[in-house]
């Protein structure tokens, strides 16, 4: 299988369970990398029986219609910010965040506290943020969505924090995935805040580094800016992100952080992929997702060719037409 790097922990646990329940199935070495990288690898090699992405657009844009013709949205996570507690700015932000947890959401004081948090992260000249590349990792553009939504929510100006970070090259360090950013934080404190982070990765990663004696944590964000609440879909859509690199320009829609999965048309072992997804949709699998900060979408939502979904999976999914109020978080046209 090939899957978004932030699914590494949940999917590794599911693969271990798969080995237990299906001892006769040989499991190949999974590739956990940026969603775009994984999808392009499948388009080039057709080696995967399963491909999973951390957004709703990568699989359709890269694999439809020649390599896959549907995707199943199975979980939603939320953006968080990983904080280096070994730096003064990190300590200050964490202290303010704890204060915000005691304040009434949307009150004047709560708004002021969140403004102070983002001022430190985005405006202070001596802080540097870590972000991933929008072209290799969805969390790269999703981090930009968070900054724009924070500007809109707290400053009534979507560009306020985005400009402060992305218009100043010294303000951010960009890598292909958020895993690479954690290494930067750990090795030399060169970034104090990682904006390209999901709960699904922040929970196990911060635990791992804490066990190594490094003082880092993550802070959660309000639902109206964390891309983790489907009921805020219309607010998320008030902003979008345009990114240019090496002459290539792309505009990204700010959608909830939804994990999707497909079984490619040329899957070498389709039945093993079906069995994995049956495990994922089982009570055991759903608990594994929750353990890593992924809220299951039940039933799963099929975008694309519903009739191509294997029969065994049908009891656990519905076509997008059945939940049309969520259609705007998927690409505009079905294949």
Located regions from the model:
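Generic beta-strand structural signal
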Residues: 70, 79, 127-129
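Acidic, Gly/Pro-rich loop/turn segments at junctions of secondary structure
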Residues: 51-68, 80
């Amino acid at each position: 299988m090939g899957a978004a790097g932030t699914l590494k922990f949940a999917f590794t646990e599911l693969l271990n369970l798969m080995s237990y329940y299906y001892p006769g199935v040989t499991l190949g070495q999974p590739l956990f990398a940026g969603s775009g990288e994984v999808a392009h690898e499948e388009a080039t090699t057709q080696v995967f029986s399963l491909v999973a992405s951390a957004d709703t657009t990568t699989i359709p844009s890269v694999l439809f219609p020649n390599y896959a013709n549907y995707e199943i949205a199975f979980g939603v996570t939320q953006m968080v910010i990983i904080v280096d507690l070994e730096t003064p700015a990190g300590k200050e932000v964490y202290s303010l965040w704890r204060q915000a947890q005691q304040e009434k959401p949307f009150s004047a004081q709560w708004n002021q506290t969140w403004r102070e948090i983002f001022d430190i992260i985005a405006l202070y000249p001596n802080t540097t943020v870590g972000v991933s590349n929008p072209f290799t990792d969805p969390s790269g553009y999703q981090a930009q969505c968070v900054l724009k939504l924070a500007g809109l929510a707290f400053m009534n100006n979507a560009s306020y924090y985005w400009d402060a970070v992305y218009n100043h090259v010294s303000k951010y360090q960009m890598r292909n995935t958020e895993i690479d950013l954690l290494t930067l934080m750990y090795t030399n404190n060169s970034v104090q805040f990682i904006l390209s982070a999901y709960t699904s990765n922040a929970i196990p990663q911060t635990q791992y580094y804490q066990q190594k004696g490094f003082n880092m944590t993550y802070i959660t964000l309000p639902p109206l800016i964390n891309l983790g609440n489907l009921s805020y879909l219309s607010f998320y859509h008030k902003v979008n992100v345009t990114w240019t690199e090496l002459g290539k320009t792309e505009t990204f829609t700010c959608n909830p952080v939804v994990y999707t999965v497909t079984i490619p048309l040329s899957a070498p072992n389709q039945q093993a992929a079906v069995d994995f997804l049956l495990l994922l949709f089982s009570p055991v699998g759903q608990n594994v997702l929750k353990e890593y900060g992924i809220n299951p979408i039940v039933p799963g939502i099929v975008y694309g060719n519903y009739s191509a979904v294997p029969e065994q999976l049908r009891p656990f999914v519905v076509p997008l037409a059945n939940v049309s109020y969520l259609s705007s978080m998927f690409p505009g046209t079905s294949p």
